[in-house]
Amino acid sequence: MTVETFKPKQTTTLDTPAKRLEAASTNAVTTGNRIGFVSLGCPKNLVDSERILTQLRIDGYEVTNSYDNADLVIVNTCGFIDAAVEESLDAVREALEENGKVIVTGCLGAKENQIREVYPDVLEITGPHSYEAVLKHVHKYVPKPEHNPFTSLIPQTGVKLTPKHYAYLKISEGCDNRCTFCIIPSLRGDLNSRPAGSILDEAKRLVESGVQEILVVSQDTSAYGKDKSGRTDFWDGMPVKQDITSLARQLGKMGAWVRLHYIYPYPWVDDLIPLMAEGLILPYLDIPMQHASPRILKMMKRPGRVDRQLEAIQRWREICPDLVIRSTFIVGFPGETEEDFQILLDFLKEARLDRVGCFKYSEVDGAVANTIAELISEDVKEDRYHRFMELQAEISAERLARFVGRTLDILIDDVDEEGAIGRSFADAPEIDGMVFINGETELEPGMLVRARITHSDEHDLWAEVVDADTQD
């Protein structure tokens, strides 16, 4: 969807449904040491789940998608906003009812007392990215097998919960910003960037395994390397600067689509746009702006010069005309007046953003924003949300219409009896629109095809595959 509201099983900018690992070909051998796994929340959490699952495989455990067959269940939780907390607690409850032996990890795990008050029978609780602690607890309750029949079956890239043709690449943990509506720093700590060489090694393995699209994620992607104090790392025998522009340039040389998510609006974002214009990385910018009223942005502790943001958008589009901009906004923030909201609507009209998500402010336990001003009534929040959505739907339809008649590369995600479903450079998986190619039932997921866009609406595109000699 181009414009969406928050639903359970969804995060601030990316919609990642709860996933139980499907027992695939690597489950062919029965070990008697079976672990069930439920992963909730954002793509960053999904990467954490993949790391835990990979180590479980290395340690010889079988991962099952059945509560009944599991000797223990791990629930990797989200705790960002109240709806996510509710979903996580529901998942813990279900795991306890269906199995009884549960380890909880992830963001909500940082609030152990909140979980224990409701579910005191949970075996163990750990916070986010506590991989070693989770594995230690698993070994305690389900001893590690002496013989590991899975070692030769573990992919070089580790266990992945995404389709084979795309993968999330997490480049850092934590965040140094202190947005008043957010509690991520208290859950995941300050910025901690991975070494550039380690990131590039992982990216290379992903591409060699057949991954066609790398989705770069973190809490604050554009801040990558700020904590490295200018230190250079090495990769493939060559020095690599540890900043987001240098990292993106190296990733762009690997032959896969590179899509950047969670770009905080720092001034040096300007340096990324030429890479998009050159075709090194996708011309797609996920840059959460949150609001447009200077007063509200100040209360949020976000950058507050809307005029500069509009100038930047114009500048970026002049450099890279195909640029697609995704953003997210909060309506009904404490203290938001009708005048503040109108400033936001005026900003949308002028900015003409491509993809936009809207959230009605929700109190988050521990967030400063809950007490800085009078809370907005649910009726007012609902009214502003619908007005926001209605306006942005018109803008999104207008922006998508510019693709009609053009021929684009389409990455196929799924094929059914009616045809193929894919995405263009303008579409991130699960949160943006899709490209429908009716009648093309012979295509396969992971294929990259050229297709001419024939129709559009406010969310999606329709296309037909073209031969090489008829392409634009």
UniProtKB/Swiss-Prot annotation:
InterPro entries reported in the protein's UniProt record: Elp3/MiaA/NifB-like_rSAM, Methylthiotransferase, Methylthiotransferase_CS, Methylthiotransferase_N, Methylthiotransferase_N_sf, NA-bd_OB-fold, Ribosomal_uS12_MeSTrfase_RimO, rSAM
Note on cofactor: Binds 2 [4Fe-4S] clusters. One cluster is coordinated with 3 cysteines and an exchangeable S-adenosyl-L-methionine.
GO MF annotation: an example: aspartic acid methylthiotransferase activity
Binding site for [4Fe-4S] cluster 2: C175, C179, C182
Enzyme Commission code(s) on record: 2.8.4.4
Needed cofactors: [4Fe-4S] cluster
The keyword Iron-sulfur is annotated on this UniProt entry: yes
Keywords: 4Fe-4S, Cytoplasm, Iron, Iron-sulfur, Metal-binding, S-adenosyl-L-methionine, Transferase
Enzyme class: transferase
Compartments (UniProt record): Cytoplasm
Chain sites annotated for binding [4Fe-4S] cluster 1: C42, C78, C107
Residues covered by the Radical SAM core domain: 161-398
Residue stretches making up the MTTase N-terminal domain: 33-143
Swiss-Prot/TrEMBL catalytic activity: L-aspartate(89)-[ribosomal protein uS12]-hydrogen + (sulfur carrier)-SH + AH2 + 2 S-adenosyl-L-methionine = 3-methylsulfanyl-L-aspartate(89)-[ribosomal protein uS12]-hydrogen + (sulfur carrier)-H + 5'-deoxyadenosine + L-methionine + A + S-adenosyl-L-homocysteine + 2 H(+)
Primary role: Catalyzes the methylthiolation of an aspartic acid residue of ribosomal protein uS12.
Protein name, as recorded: Ribosomal protein uS12 methylthiotransferase RimO
Organism: Shewanella putrefaciens (strain CN-32 / ATCC BAA-453)
